[in-house]
Amino acid sequence: MLWVGHARNIGTPTRLGLAVSQRLASQPMSRPISFLSDFGHDDEFVGVVHGVLAKLAPQSRVIDVGHGFPRGNVRSAALALTRSVQYLPEGVCLAVVDPGVGTDRRAIAAETEWGFFVGPDNGLLSPAVAMVGGAGMVVSIENPEAMIPSPGETFHGRDVFAPAAALLASGEAGIDELGPEIAGEELVPLLLPLTETKGSAVAGEAWWVDNFGNVQTNIAPEDLSGVGLGPGKTVTVKVGSTIYSVPWVTSYGDVGDGEVLMHVDSVGLLALAVRGGRADEELNLSEGVAVTVTGSRSAKAE
């Protein structure tokens, strides 16, 4: 038995007849749980999930990776998780951005060398799982004893994913007890565009706009070195029909206030920024907008 609970009362989890105090006293592990979602902080959803985790895995530290991602934007959250996972403590990752909640999309748990990933099978987990070396085992979470009974099907973060993450974090259950194994190659991938080199130009797109208005692209420094561009040079950045002459520098302090710059960001990709301002507004950029970089041509022109 993995779970004892009621629709209106989470109850007390037990395992092999051990009382909670006995189990915790001898528990061999307490993995940290890294929690990411699009729940925001205006409602009780994040707090309720924390409550479930605290009841079922009271010794596990919970790290909030972020909850302010655009609602239902799987790509945005998946990229954030991929950027973050190498800096998170090994343990359990609970990720919930689930526009397909209540449909036939699978709820999954994946075991990797880093630890466990728990969430919907909609591409959210795939890049991060690949980043840490791939999954050794993946299961479809179907065991009702590992879930909170619920009158509705719209809060799987609370009822399905949080209990599974807590059981794995506390060692209360093995991944094979959550449901049947599925082939790793059956996981829904996250389709991401690749850069394309056309002569002396590298075409990519804006991947992420952070709270400061900095715009991360999917273009790596190696992409530009292949066309003879490198730090210290001035490049031409084309967004739509507008062309900008932008210095490739190391830090914001290398340009004057209000000036546009390009630099290698904290995860190793090229980003556009404005010292003391917002590059997304200055360059009219948002996630998914095409960006092309070539050698310098001229100053900003329409």
Task: Describe the residue ranges of each PLM region.
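Short hydrophobic alpha-helical segments enriched in small aliphatic residues
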Residues: 7-10
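Short, Lys/Arg-enriched N-terminal segments with co-localized hydrophobic residues
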Residues: 15-28
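N-terminal glycine-rich anion-binding loop in soluble enzyme alpha/beta folds
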Residues: 30-68
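Active-site histidine-anchored catalytic micro-motif
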Residues: 32, 56-62, 73-76, 87-159
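Conserved active-site and cofactor/substrate-binding residues in soluble primary-metabolism enzymes
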Residues: 44, 48, 57, 72, ...
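Anionic-ligand-binding alpha/beta catalytic cores of soluble enzymes and soluble regulatory domains
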Residues: 149-223, 227-228
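A conserved acidic, glycine/proline-rich C-terminal tail/linker
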Residues: 218-283
